[in-house]
A protein has these predicted regions:
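Non-catalytic, solvent-exposed segments at the cell envelope interface
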Residues: 1-402
Length: 402
């Protein structure tokens, strides 16, 4: 039987809960959740349609990875100074689960994207100032302030949620935050994961991380370094790092879903203790119910997509393109997003065409997104620091052994 190897870390989290009904009461106490409705102004948010339930409607989740490197999180050679010791969001995904539970799209938002960040309330009663053309991951930092505890993380997630809604006009139902130190523990609880490394990594100046090209087995610390590294590989951009993070997520999900770890208390504990969530999805019954509802999603109906973007005037920043608007509109309307149309070709070797090309072009047409074949080629190369966006990743069985 084919394994659903392409689920993101979100999907791993969802599925472990559905496998753990026998331990609900014990597990519930391990998830930290906050009610952020009190600090989100309903007047400033896109509308939602009743009933206020996951049943029978599309679900939009914001999944964030935090990047505090203080204390136990400082496992990759960084110094844990003020710049990295406070809570920061290094990874952001808008995960759309279709109303019919037959399709999942996960859209990565580059942290260096320039966006308008609204004023945000925090759980400690303060408010932050609005920013025009702020760096996307500053939204999380604004909400979290100088803190790195769970309450600061929840406030950071709330401000990021408001920023995403302002940029996309999509109502975000819930958030899930996964800390990077937790990522290391989850990989270790899996016994490590295999990743196909396309280009050797050598970062002597910043983290000291080295990784050879080819199929490599990563333990928790190596996986964390692989997910974080920007120097000593490729063009050093956040866009190329997103591609590596997506590959690692798929490898983790593949390992979890192809073994019996989903029912092992060590894996459940290490996974769930890494989470900070909004109130509804932090309740085991709701999380488990969502898990059961997506069990029938086919491997060919799960897409990782990088938000279409281009270089900004500042060569170290990117801005959303018109293609990004089409992607967000497709999700808002609960329509398929063409993998090819969502993100043009990169400098990597192109994927081989398959029999689904015609149907994907039709899906793109339905979603209001032009198929890749009709898009005009770029007239110039991207500026330094802003690599071409990565194509959507179709989950496939890895040639790297599990």
């Amino acid at each position: 039987m084919a394994r659903r190897a392409g689920f993101s870390l979100l999907a791993v989290t969802v599925f472990v809960v559905s496998a753990a009904g026998f331990a609900w009461h014990n597990i519930q106490s391990r998830i930290t959740w906050f009610d952020i409705d009190s600090i989100l102004s309903e007047n400033d948010r896109p509308g939602t349609k009743p009933p206020d339930s996951y049943d029978g409607r599309a679900v939009n989740l914001l999944v964030l990875g935090t990047d505090s490197r203080a204390g136990d999180n400082n496992v990759d050679g960084s110094q844990g100074d003020d710049e990295v010791s406070v809570a920061r969001s290094d990874t952001a995904l808008v995960v759309h689960i279709s109303a019919d539970r037959k399709r999942i799209d996960a859209v990565s938002i580059p942290r260096d994207t320039l966006v308008d960040i609204p004023s945000c309330k925090t759980l400690d009663g303060n408010s932050t100032g609005a920013e025009e053309d702020g760096q996307f991951n500053s939204a999380f930092a604004n909400g979290a302030g100088s803190g790195s505890d769970k309450k600061a993380v929840a406030s950071g997630a709330a401000c990021t949620l408001k920023t995403v809604e302002k940029m996309t006009n999509i109502r975000i139902d819930d958030f899930i935050v996964i800390d990077f130190n937790g990522l290391s523990k989850v990989v270790d609880s899996l016994g490590g994961v295999h990743v196909q490394v396309d280009e050797a990594i050598d970062d002597p100046d910043y983290t000291g991380f080295k990784l050879d090209e080819g199929c490599q087995k990563l333990d928790g610390q190596a996986a964390l370094q692989y997910a974080r590294v920007r120097h000593g590989v490729g063009d050093g951009s956040d866009i190329s790092r997103i591609s590596r993070q997506q590959k690692l997520m798929s490898a983790m999900a593949s390992k979890a879903l192809s073994s019996n770890v989903l029912t092992q208390s060590g894996f459940l504990t290490s996974t769930l203790e890494t989470l900070t969530t909004s109130e509804r999805i932090g309740q085991i019954g709701n999380l488990s119910g969502l898990a059961y509802s997506v069990q029938g999603v086919g491997i060919d109906k799960i897409n990782f997509i990088t938000m279409p973007n281009e270089a900004a005037a500042d060569e170290n920043r990117v801005i959303p393109t018109e293609g990004a608007k089409k992607v967000w509109k497709a999700l808002e309307q609960d329509k398929p997003v063409s993998a090819d149309a969502a993100a043009p070709a990169t400098t990597d070797a192109p994927a081989t065409a398959d029999d689904s090309a015609t149907s994907e072009e039709q899906n793109a047409e339905d979603a209001g997104v032009e198929p890749a074949a009709t898009q005009a080629p770029a007239t110039q190369s991207p500026k330094a620091g802003a690599s071409p966006q990565q194509p959507a990743t179709k989950p496939t069985a890895s040639a790297c052994p599990a």
